[in-house]
Amino acid sequence: MILSIGEILADLIGEKNDGALTFRAFCGGAPFNLAVNAKQSGATVGFVGRVGNDVIGRFVTAEAEKANLDSLDVQTDEKRNTTIAFVTLMNGERDFAFNRHDTADFNIDFDKIYFAKYENLNIVHLGS
């Protein structure tokens, strides 16, 4: 089993549309994306992350549940917000701007992770 621990956030992908820059939200974050891709490749995968108790946190948690990971543990932080990544594509290159200052994903409560529930744990991936 692979356990990926780290950020889960909203990727807001920007597109120019009739002179306005509009954004569509997707669930993302490198550790979460790794978990999803490993699961799609046939691995047994768990993910642990942390979001704020906000509309973005509820959105990414609901989207994460659709990934059908073998284990999903998304903690909720009552004091901090969920990270947002604004992503634009200009001249064929991705440009990132993060709304990230003391956000929930930097404050995972490792004492609340019950590692014993992850049977046959072979790989632990930590990311930000």
Predicted features by range, described:
Residues 44, 48-128:
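Conserved N-terminal subdomain of the carbohydrate kinase-like
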Residues 1-69, 108-110:
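Glycine-rich phosphate/adenosyl-contacting loop at the front of the ribokinase-like
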